Amino acid sequence: MPKKILVLHTGGTISMQADASGAVVTSQDNPMNHVSNPLEGIEVHALDFFNLPSPHIKPKHMLALYHKIKEEANNYDGVVITHGTDTLEETAYFLDTMEIPHMPIVLTGAMRSSNELGSDGVYNYLSALRVASDDKAADKGVLVVMNDEIHAAKYVTKTHTTNVGTFQTPTHGPLGLIMKQEILYFKTAEPRVRFDLEHIQGLVPIISAYAGMTDELIDMLDLDHLDGLVVQAFGAGNVPKETAQKLESLLQKDIPVALVSRCFNGIAEPVYAYQGGGVQLQRAGVFFVKELNAQKARLKLLIALNAGLKGQELRNYMEG
């Protein structure tokens, strides 16, 4: 029996073409729909679910993808989602926090549009189909497949504006490799809390620490509509003292604050006890989010709030 793979196209560079001027534009006719499938034992059913450049993707689109996957789970052996690369890691992480069915779910994209020299779209697409049809991928969580590498949704991030090897996993490295004849996995996905959301809403912005930062940036936020805040802090998790004071005032208003490091590698942890240091921030109630970048920490907090987590339960989830 061939493996039946559901392909959900959502737009992005992989579906686009460069025009005569060299500008990459959206195409109404997705070139991936015309790719002949040379892979034996794989039956592809493709659907143009969205046709959006990935900067237009919102959590509501991510949730719609989750609901579609749940709806079709009994009809397929795996899922491939083609997606623009700018926010691909966020959609992958969002899906990875949902109660996804036990099947391979793979996101892929392209750094070069379909008619550019050296286009990587078709190769990445076929690689994703290979992984989605592999039974060993079913217990790895949501995966990102690009440039012969397999990455865990939780850790992967886009690291280069144009290079085809843009997707990397800082600190941990890739979860597996795609070889000519086989697929090699180095690691298994870790167990985690998953949610089954029907709706998602809320305002959780991200601010980044910088030298000379004061409390003015936080003062610009509309606190009456603020559901939470993510801070990209210095180093192991430190901010200027003026910023720390303002964060404490948010916490006193029961507005949760999550902290990550702005460093590319490493993990945020409370080390320094000076004013604005991580020790003081954690004592005040700031959540130290391990191993996630700011954009994923934002989704984590947004999902937790929509799931109704509060108090110690919210802290345990955010810091777990």
PLM region spans:
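ATP/NTP phosphate-donor binding region
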Residues: 1-70, 245, 265, 288
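Structural motif
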Residues: 77-78, 228
